[in-house]
Regions:
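PLP-dependent amino-acid enzyme catalytic core
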Residues: 1-503
């Protein structure tokens, strides 16, 4: 049975259920398993497997203490009736993004209830967490999910956990630094167990504060007297990360079925990412046997990952830019820690030292040997705001296909980076429906943008012949239920107050 431990220590190994329930390790590290890759997902027969079967295979390989019937139930509950496309994450073919002629495909990850890729994992995580109850007499313990969001995680987590028994959720978002649609998705969320709060600061401020909340032993002791423990719905929780591995295999299976590739062909994935979780799932897929030639990191103007992969120095001491791709406006990429662990061959002392330097000094520099190993797997590129707008227009002009600003970062990077030799296809992960960012998309197409985002949606619909998802268009008529805004140092009190209302 696979066990999980912190990226910063081999002590106190846990089962996957325990790791999911806790969310983050007591020393601040993230949970990893040294058995990653010991089980391989067979490529033979992959083309015949639908998404639900693939999900059962991948989850069984990574969450080994869940019984097969538990995994089957989680998969059924998460995906059978909650996604608008039968493929769950369908693949669309575009014209080659680069002059090298290698086919380009888009993996649409936004057909879930909140129109963002986070739905794939956050429809699954509550089901996994519901089956982590202990048998040691503490089964009545309640869980308070605490999550910082740069835009999409918040609504997807709220939708997944709303009214879940024995669970509450507190979501923090940076006030004024998410799109109007994203903010309304959160502030109109219904549910007796949900709490939403804006924070005065950026996402990194909020995410750092959440980690400090998890490390606050006095707070944990006070909550324990109420029968409450804290956990996370961010991708720092391994139960959030693992479900994302599935759609890499699903994309490959669809290309096999369409005849675009043959079994064993290598493919590239380009991933718009800020917190490194989505692309880390691709690395997990590679370790599980998927023929991944290269994983390409696409960043926006907050290009800390580009600089890191280019120079080997991670430096968060830099200007923060508010862009049209708010879910990538991040300067501290939490999931990078897991990648460092695996590519340093499990060197917990090195990882602990680097993370300490990042916290205390704001930067760290990798050993040359480790940087070389990382570059064998990961490439990188980035797009500024003008390049993002041009990419949205180019994709529409060349393909009649709308993309959001996050996806546009990846489209730009692919168009300026030839495929690695031997790669038979390039797959761009599309992380959000373009109607979540109607103003940016309409502006990029040169359309008139009314002051109201919902009027922008209508302009976009008329000009392109596409339709806004119903769940987004209806937001303008929903009452705002959450109006709290706090300073960063008020977040812990907000969580404690929300936990006091759990039933």
């Amino acid at each position: 049975m696979a066990t999980y431990h912190s990226t910063r220590s081999h002590e106190a190994p846990l089962t996957s259920k325990e790791a999911i329930r806790r969310g983050i390790a007591p020393d601040g590290g993230l949970y990893v398993s040294d058995e990653l890759g010991c089980t391989q997902i067979p490529l033979a027969g992959l083309s015949e497997m639908g998404y639900l079967n693939l999900a059962r295979e991948v989850l069984a390989a990574l969450l080994t203490d869940y019984a097969p019937e538990e995994i089957a139930a989680c998969v059924s509950e998460a995906y059978e009736e909650t996604f608008a496309d039968a493929e769950i994450t369908p693949v669309r073919r575009l014209a080659p993004a680069n002059a090298d002629g290698v086919p380009t495909h888009v993996l649409e990850l936004w057909h879930g209830p909140t129109s963002a890729f986070k739905d794939v994992a956050l429809q699954m995580l509550p089901r996994l967490m519901a089956r982590t109850g202990s048998n040691d007499g503490t089964g009545d313990e309640k869980i308070m999910i605490v999550t910082a969001t740069s835009g999409d995680t918040g609504k997807a987590a709220l939708a997944g956990f709303a009214d879940a028994p024995g669970v509450g959720i507190s979501v923090f978002y940076p006030e004024g630094k998410v799109s109007r649609v994203q903010e309304l998705q959160m502030s109109t969320q219904e549910g007796a167990n949900v709490a939403v709060c804006g924070v005065r600061g950026n996402f990194d401020d909020a995410q750092t504060a959440v980690k400090q909340i998890f490390a606050d032993r006095e707070l944990a002791e006070r909550l324990a007297t109420q029968g409450v423990m804290l956990s996370s719905a961010n991708s720092i929780n391994v139960g959030r990360l693992v479900p994302q591995v599935v759609y890499y295999f699903a994309a490959y299976a669809q290309l096999l079925r369409s005849g675009d590739i043959s079994c064993g062909d290598e493919v590239e994935f380009c991933v718009p990412t800020g917190n490194f979780g989505d692309i880390l799932a691709g690395y997990y897929a590679k370790r599980l046997g998927l023929p991944v030639a290269r994983l390409i990191v696409a960043s926006d103007a907050n290009n800390v990952l580009f600089d890191f992969l280019t120079t080997g120095t991670y430096d968060r001491k830099r200007p923060f830019f508010t862009t049209t791709s708010p879910s990538m406006d991040i300067l501290v990429s939490s999931n990078l820690e897991r990648m460092l662990y695996y590519l340093s061959d499990g060197d917990v002392e090195l990882v602990s030292r680097l993370m300490g330097q990042l916290a205390d000094e704001g930067s760290y520099t990798l050993p040359d040997e480790l940087l070389s190993k990382i570059r064998e797997v990961f490439a990188c590129g980035w797009a500024d705001e003008d390049e993002v707008a041009r990419a949205i227009k180019a994709c529409w002009d060349e393909n009649g296909y709308l993309i959001d600003p996050h996806t546009a970062c990846g489209y730009h990077v692919l168009s300026h980076m030839p495929a690695v030799p031997g790669s038979k296809a390039r797959i761009l992960l599309s992380t959000a429906n373009p109607y979540k960012f109607p103003r940016a998309v309409a502006g990029a197409l040169g359309l008139f943008c009314p002051p109201d985002d919902f009027a922008c949606m209508q302009v976009l619909e008329k000009a392109t012949g596409t339709c806004a998802p119903t769940q987004l268009a209806e937001l303008q008529d929903k009452p705002v239920l959450h109006t709290d805004v706090v300073d960063i140092d008020g977040m812990a009190s907000f969580v404690e107050q929300a936990a006091g209302g759990l039933k």
